[in-house]
Design a protein with these regions (language model features):
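Acidic donor-binding segment of Leloir-type glycosyltransferases
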Residues: 36-78
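A conserved hydrophobic helix/loop-capping motif in glycosyltransferases and polysaccharide synthases
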Residues: 15-27, 31, 38-39, 51, ...
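Cell-envelope/extracellular polymer assembly enzymes that use nucleotide-activated donors
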Residues: 14-16, 47, 211
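A short, conserved alpha-helix in the catalytic core of glycosyltransferases
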Residues: 113-119, 174-195, 200-213
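A recurrent flexible, glycine/aromatic-enriched loop bordering the glycosyltransferase active site
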Residues: 86, 137, 150-189, 204
Length: 213
């Protein structure tokens, strides 16, 4: 008899995009709107989880609530007390037992097929646990000047520059000593093995992703 066909590989998990929010309405709007705008350009299944970390800004809270009502796939959580970055993203990462997670600072902007590229890099090998992209201002992931803020060139916006860089070395990835929490993709199997961020040791934040990696 003919050999049985090989089973199809299991589909990769969907992704929870987790954005902790505390202040700065304009930056938060740009971040969330960029995620929503480019969702249609990415085939990776995703859910947006925005967590208001007890913001004192009533205008920000009002905008988030209105936006969550209008947008499908937008889950808004509100902390009763300020938990800081670590406690807040830990809450986000427990909203699913199976989805991968992507931590995104509220002062970032994304563009084009950003999520598909991060997802592809995460599943390039079984030994990959986290993925962090380059950015114009992200310490060891700053590009082209390492550990410096790189202003956008004149007449370039985020999407235009992203498309240029994506075409320069398409699909390329390198190993780095640690992920950086401004935009950090974490595979669920990695999260299950390591556990959540260490809120007891790192309190309100800074250094928790280095400890995790």
């Amino acid at each position: 008899p003919a050999p049985a066909p090989a089973p199809a590989p299991a589909p990769a998990p969907a992704v929870d995009i987790i954005i902790p929010v505390y202040k700065d309405l304009e930056e938060t709007q740009r971040c969330i709107q960029s995620v929503l705008r480019y969702a249609r350009d990415n085939i990776t299944a995703s859910r947006l989880i925005v967590i208001n970390d007890a913001s004192p800004d009533s205008a920000l809270t009002h905008w988030l609530r209105n936006e969550a009502k209008k947008q499908p796939g937008f889950l808004l959580l509100e902390n009763e007390d300020n938990l800081g970055f670590v406690g807040t993203v830990n809450r986000g990462m427990t909203q699913s037992a199976t989805n991968d997670v992507l931590l995104l600072n509220s002062d970032t902007e994304v563009a084009n097929q950003w999520l598909d590229r991060l997802h592809a890099a995460a599943y390039r090998g079984a030994n990959v646990g986290t993925v962090t992209p380059f950015s114009n201002n992200a310490t060891i992931c700053s590009y082209p000047r390492f550990c410096q803020e790189n202003s956008l060139p004149p007449n370039y916006d985020t999407a235009t520059l992203d498309a240029l860089f994506a075409a320069t070395h398409p699909g390329a990835s390198i190993e780095i000593p640690t992920g950086v929490g401004f935009c950090m993709y974490i595979r669920r199997d990695c999260l299950q093995q390591i556990g959540l961020f260490d809120a007891e040791s790192f309190g309100k934040g800074y250094g928790e992703e280095n400890d995790f990696c």
